Amino acid sequence: MKKYILLLVLAVCACVFAYVNSGKDETPAKPVLRIGVECDYAPNNWEEKRPSAFNLPLSNQEGAYADGYDLQIAKLVADDMGATLEVRKIAWNDLLPALQRGEIDAIFSGMLDTEERRRQAAFSDPYEVTATEYSVVVNTSSPYANAKKLTDFSGAKFTGQKGTKLYSSIGQMPGAIAMPAVDNVSEMLDAVTSGKVDGIVINLDTGRSYEATHSNLKLIRFPENEGFVIGFSGICAGVRKNDTELLNRINMVIERTTKNERQKIMDATVSRLLKNAS
């Protein structure tokens, strides 16, 4: 009889112990915000090989890290959500498909909210410091290095990234020759630095960083109302169309971050980029 009583007591104690311990694991896990980044469009995003106080590890590429203005804005969103930020490096043409497949929650990759892309995803308000402006970067040895207007590029050879406005905008320069499109922005940069093409169309901020880090490149900016017609709001974050809660949270953070604060983020980002290039 004593044996049965002892077993009963042990069973009750085990149940109590299990109940008490089960309560220890009831704290909700920290949410994760998964973003996709191309890592090839400085100063918005680029890849590094060493960790720093500013970059984030790429979850799908061991020993690699991502930094850039896009990443710093995404950090603000993740902090506001109380979430861990997970960054995946994804090729440009696979960013929207990856979003639709559910592999990532948002795109923070210098992406413009073009009409075609708006059919595939919902986009936040622009988070740039200033409105998007396209410029031209030319090789200083090109006969077009002193061009000042879009019409001055007749006969010039240009290339751009496949499936982007950087390539289709070449058609706005009368007489310019659109060479075959390339797969990424790095190949655009290689083409103009090597002299394979005379120039490339590029976002103004990126063009400035190229000019600052390459002695044989020159940025050409056009007067207001005399440059490219771009037809979109600007650089935005992309989410799935039904993810209104995340979209609203991103927009709230963008609205709350003043232009002055965003300028400071961009200035610090460009400073790191130039330091890395020196």
Functional labels for PLM-detected ranges:
Residues 73, 149-152, 203, 241-256, ...:
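Short amphipathic alpha-helical coupling segments at ligand-binding clamshell hinges
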Residues 28-111, 119:
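Extracytoplasmic small-molecule ligand-binding "clamshell" domains
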Residues 1-32:
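Short, low-complexity disordered leader/linker segments with a strong preference
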Residues 75, 79, 84-152, 224-230:
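Acidic, polar ligand-binding/catalytic clefts
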Residues 40, 128-140, 211-255, 272-278:
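Periplasmic-binding protein-like
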Residues 93-94, 108-120, 169-172, 193, ...:
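A ligand-binding cleft/hinge motif common to bilobed small-molecule-binding domains
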Residues 39-42, 63-80, 135-187, 204-205, ...:
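Bilobed "Venus flytrap"/periplasmic-binding protein-like clamshell domains
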Residues 16-20, 165-180, 218-221, 251-278:
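Ligand-binding clefts/hinges and TM-proximal coupling segments of bilobed small-molecule sensing domains
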